[in-house]
């Protein structure tokens, strides 16, 4: 299934690129289509590993119109253990408008949705204190939709996302409290979580701040700070930081980023892998190489 989806996206990219080629060759071109293929030593989202600390691939196609309209389709490989039952990939679709001066104030507004085909989990949404048994087992998916606001000044960019879907990547009473109950040696915090009642995480906020410093014509220093505030589940709140270098050479972009997530509840960032439990929130050097067409 994953091969088929990758092949479909590659074919779509090739078709869109061939259609756009005549327009780009014309001085009156009003839009562009760019395809990017990337190989990474680890697929990290907000500094948390989606690929269980293993290598991953990304394929993206971006459409940009001179009016400011943009659209993005991106496929990334992920771990089916991190995202239970998944087909091994997720798909990000986004559209919106960007406007302003790239060297001064610039802005963006849009909508985005992440799909995790096949990914779902069953978890208890309540806990009976009288019997000591979890109850109300329900199925939850990881698919998430966002409203996106971008603000920037020169090389400084901020991105604010608000979760529109019922849950943020499965964050719910079953997803958060259930994970804590399953993996914690002391169930007290999980029971406190359940005691707050049945909640979802719609309305959560994700904020990122990025600054790029040119070191030369080909090399850029990247600085990042971010935070997420998950509605109804303070246990899932955390901040992340990274510092990296991007270098352009031989038609490729080479990058090295040291990512540092600062989480509060380790059980929420652990994955059962056979008879082992692996943490996906460790500090790590992430290497990547990409090519744009």
Cite the ranges covered by each PLM segment.
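Short glycine/proline- and aromatic-enriched beta-strand/turn motifs that initiate or cap beta-hairpins
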Residues: 25-81, 180-182
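Residue-level signature of outer-membrane beta-barrel architecture
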Residues: 26, 63-65, 97-99, 113, ...
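Outer-membrane beta-barrel pore domains and translocons
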Residues: 38-42, 74-78, 98, 112-116, ...
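Cleavable N-terminal export/targeting peptides
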Residues: 1-32
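Repeated loop/turn-to-beta-strand initiation elements of outer-membrane beta-barrel proteins
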Residues: 67-73, 102-109, 155-160, 217-223, ...
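Outer-membrane beta-barrel "beta-signal"
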Residues: 245-250, 258, 277-293
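Residues that define the transmembrane beta-barrel architecture of outer-membrane proteins
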Residues: 31, 53-57, 87-91, 105, ...
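Outer-membrane pore/translocation modules
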Residues: 84-202, 276
């Amino acid at each position: 299934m994953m091969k088929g989806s990758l092949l479909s996206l590659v074919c779509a990219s090739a078709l869109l690129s061939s259609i756009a080629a005549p327009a780009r060759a014309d001085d009156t071109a009003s839009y562009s289509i760019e395809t990017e293929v990337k190989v990474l030593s680890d697929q990290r989202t907000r500094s948390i590993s989606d690929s269980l600390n293993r290598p991953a691939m990304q394929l993206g196609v971006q459409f940009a119109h001179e009016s400011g309209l943009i659209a993005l389709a991106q496929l990334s490989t992920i771990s089916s253990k991190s995202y239970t039952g998944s087909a091994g990939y997720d798909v990000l679709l986004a559209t919106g408008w960007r406007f302003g001066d790239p060297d001064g104030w610039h802005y963006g507004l849009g909508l985005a949705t992440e799909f995790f085909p096949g990914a779902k989990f069953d978890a208890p949404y309540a806990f009976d204190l009288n019997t000591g048994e979890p109850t109300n087992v329900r199925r939850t998916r990881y698919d998430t939709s966002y409203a996106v606001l971008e603000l920037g000044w020169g090389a400084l960019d901020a991105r604010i996302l608000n979760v529109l879907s019922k849950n943020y990547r499965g964050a719910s009473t079953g997803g958060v409290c259930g994970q804590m109950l399953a993996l914690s040696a002391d169930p007290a915090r999980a029971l406190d979580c359940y005691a707050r009642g049945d909640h979802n995480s719609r309305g959560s906020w994700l904020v990122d701040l990025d600054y790029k410093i040119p070191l030369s014509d080909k090399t850029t220093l990247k600085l990042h700070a971010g935070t997420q505030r998950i509605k109804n589940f303070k246990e899932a709140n955390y901040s992340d930081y990274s510092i990296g270098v991007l270098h352009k050479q031989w038609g490729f972009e080479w990058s090295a980023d040291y990512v540092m997530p600062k989480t509060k509840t380790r059980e929420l960032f652990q994955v059962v892998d056979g008879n082992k439990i692996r943490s996906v929130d460790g500090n790590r050097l992430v290497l990547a190489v990409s090519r744009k067409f």
